[in-house]
């Protein structure tokens, strides 16, 4: 396996002790990745690496580009600031050594196309009339007695929802034709029983099992991984969100064992109130029912255009705890903080007043910088008395669950 020329390593590669010297020639990372590693064993391995680890920080324009792209794919909430910098460094190296003409500027949206066949529709459901169900076999119709025809007409509707009865005579004849006239004796069966069991055990031990020696071959057969060929820049990561963004952009993703990952997860938003789906990952409220009930679901699209959604069995995904509580009384005014309940809800713009703008006028002759000991500290305005902070700093309702128990009988200082 030819090593990749430039490899960007994430924290997962160091935690899993990946042999990066066998994967790539030049290994890059950022300093925040090393600072994330806390365990002693990994830090000891980082102190005596068998290769040169190069630290490089990405340019701000690439960080901005990757951030906007991850918002379009829906993976931005799952990415940390360090993850975005690792993605930006991979994009930067690809632009320096390969180019950006083959990279995508917009992610591919999941398209749901209708098909004539309905493979997801159950065919054999008792009590339901399904038009797409195949007709009963002709053999059973031909061998009917003519006298029973008027009786069958009254119950012809049963043929739509009941499975056709198996023809036992035909099955017995097929078994006799396959088996032949030679029937083994019981004594011979008992004698050969032990030999057959031993043969089966030996066959089970040899084939059908996934071992470290054949796991790469099985992954190649499943078309999930491949041997990297003519790859100059790649990223080694174990984060699914990072893999999805890299593959959507057209960058190369490498597994910990050095294999090239071809497929990753695609996501859509599904409303668990009206069960409608949308591929616009920037939405917060459902476009059909208007509720804040959108959940991210991983999907795969088959060749015939059918959409298969993969739901999580974790009950915490749809945990209704904290959803039933009394809403506060709506308040008006510039500094009112009301919960965001609908998509078209209007909020105050919180613009600075004219007096506040004059304080921050840097071109004024009497302007005093904030670091100066003579700078004014606002303690008399309405926003200061209400302790209104900027919304980007976490203002508003900070408690996630209003029904959570509060601490009582706290001693006051």
Swiss-Prot record:
Domain (PINc): residue spans on this chain: 5-108
Positions of region (Disordered): 116-150, 181-212, 390-413
SUPFAM superfamilies in the record: NOB1 zinc finger-like
Binding annotation for Zn(2+): 271, 274, 286, 289
GO MF term list: RNA endonuclease activity; zinc ion binding
Annotated localization: Nucleus
Span of zinc fingers (NOB1): 261-333
Gene Ontology cellular component annotations, sorted alphabetically: nucleus; preribosome, small subunit precursor
Biased composition (Acidic residues): 181-206
The family this protein is said to belong to: Belongs to the NOB1 family.
Protein name, as recorded: RNA-binding protein NOB1
């Amino acid at each position: 396996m030819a090593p990749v020329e430039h490899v960007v390593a994430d924290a997962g590669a160091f935690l899993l002790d990946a042999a990066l010297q066998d994967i790539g020639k030049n290994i890059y990372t950022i300093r925040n990745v090393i600072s994330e590693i806390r365990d002693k064993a990994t830090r000891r391995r980082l102190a005596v690496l068998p290769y040169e680890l190069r630290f490089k920080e990405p340019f701000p324009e690439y960080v901005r580009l990757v951030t906007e792209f991850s918002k379009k794919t829906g993976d931005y909430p799952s990415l940390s600031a360090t993850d975005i910098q690792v993605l930006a460094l991979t994009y930067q190296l690809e632009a320096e050594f390969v180019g950006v003409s083959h990279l995508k500027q917009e992610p591919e949206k999941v398209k749901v196309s209708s098909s004539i066949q309905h493979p997801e529709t159950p065919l054999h459901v008792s009590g339901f009339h399904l038009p797409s169900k195949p007709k009963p076999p002709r053999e059973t119709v031909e061998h009917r007695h003519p006298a029973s025809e008027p009786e069958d007409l009254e119950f012809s509707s049963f043929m739509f929802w009941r499975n056709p009865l198996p023809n036992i005579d035909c099955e017995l004849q097929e078994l006799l034709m396959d088996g032949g006239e030679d029937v083994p004796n019981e004594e011979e069966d008992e004698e050969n029983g032990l030999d057959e069991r031993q043969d089966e055990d030996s066959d089970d031990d040899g084939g059908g099992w996934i071992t470290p020696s054949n796991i790469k071959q099985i992954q190649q057969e499943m078309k999930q991984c491949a041997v990297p060929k003519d790859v100059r820049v790649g990223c080694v990561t174990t984060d699914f969100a990072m893999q999805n963004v890299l593959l959507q952009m057209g960058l190369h993703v490498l597994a910990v064992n050095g294999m090239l990952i071809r497929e990753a997860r695609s996501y859509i938003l599904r409303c668990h109130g009206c069960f409608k789906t949308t591929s616009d990952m920037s939405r917060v409220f459902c476009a059909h029912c208007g509720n804040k009930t959108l959940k991210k679901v991983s999907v795969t699209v088959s060749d015939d255009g059918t959409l298969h959604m993969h739901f999580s069995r974790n009950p915490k995904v749809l945990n209704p705890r904290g959803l039933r509580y009394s809403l506060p009384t709506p308040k008006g005014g510039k500094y009112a903080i009301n919960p965001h309940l609908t998509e078209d809800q209007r909020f105050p713009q919180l613009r600075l007043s004219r007096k506040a703008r004059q304080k921050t006028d840097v071109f004024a002759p009497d302007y005093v910088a904030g670091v100066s000991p003579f700078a004014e500290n606002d303690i008399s305005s309405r926003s200061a008395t209400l302790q209104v902070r900027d919304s980007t700093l976490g203002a508003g309702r900070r408690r996630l669950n209003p029904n959570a128990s509060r601490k009582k009988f706290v001693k006051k200082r």
